[in-house]
Amino acid sequence: MLTFDEAAEGLYVAAKYSELTLDAIEMLQRELKVPNPVPREKIHSTICYSRVMVPYSVASGSFEVATSGHLEVWNHGSSPLLVLVLDSDYLRCRHQYARAIGATHDFQDYTPHITLSYNVGVLKYPKEKYPIRVVLDREYKEPLKLDWADDLK
């Protein structure tokens, strides 16, 4: 049973990817000449960003979670993000699992994605589909950090 303090601290869960997937993401960042690319060690997909702690069990195993994605630029605060939106039933399912056990979510919908840059400036990118084999290495969880953006500076 969680204590009140534990429940109040929130939960963050993310997917980390295989070395081959990270190689492919870095190659895509280079081919697209992405400014301010997310470094290899920080590439991930958020599964759960909950303001309450829930008893989430991380999945184990390494398997393909998506075979392609398309680019979108999202406005997030003062810097436009470049994301690779993934068509991933697995990531959607894991997010739904977190919600089913009581996790909160700050947005209307959950969109599985990998952030390629936290600041692409005024650049625009075509919304075409990019074939990319996205293989899960592991999931991890930690207490929620509301000031996570400070780590990007």
From Swiss-Prot:
Q: Write out the coiled-coil annotation as residue ranges.
A: none
* Gene name of the record: g142
Q: Which family does it belong to?
A: Belongs to the anti-CBASS protein Acb1 family.
Quick one: which residues bind 3',3'-cUAMP? Y12, E142, W148
Chain residues that bind 3',3'-cGAMP: Y12, E142, W148
Report the protein name in the record: Anti-CBASS protein Acb1
Which keywords does this chain's UniProt record carry? Host-virus interaction, Hydrolase, Inhibition of host innate immune response by virus, Viral immunoevasion
- GO MF, one example: hydrolase activity
InterPro entries on file: Acb1-like_C (IPR056175), Cyclic_Pdiesterase (IPR009097)
Reaction(s) catalysed by this chain, per the record, are: 3',3'-cUAMP + H2O = U[3'-5']pAp[3'] + H(+); 3',3',3'-c-tri-AMP + H2O = A[3'-5']pA[3'-5']pAp[3'] + H(+); 3',3',3'-cAAG + H2O = G[3'-5']pA[3'-5']pAp[3'] + H(+); 3',3',3'-cAAG + H2O = A[3'-5']pG[3'-5']pAp[3'] + H(+)
Q: Where is the active site?
A: H44, T46, H113, T115
Which GO annotations describe the biological process of this protein? Answer: symbiont-mediated suppression of host innate immune response
Q: Pfam families, per this entry? A: Acb1
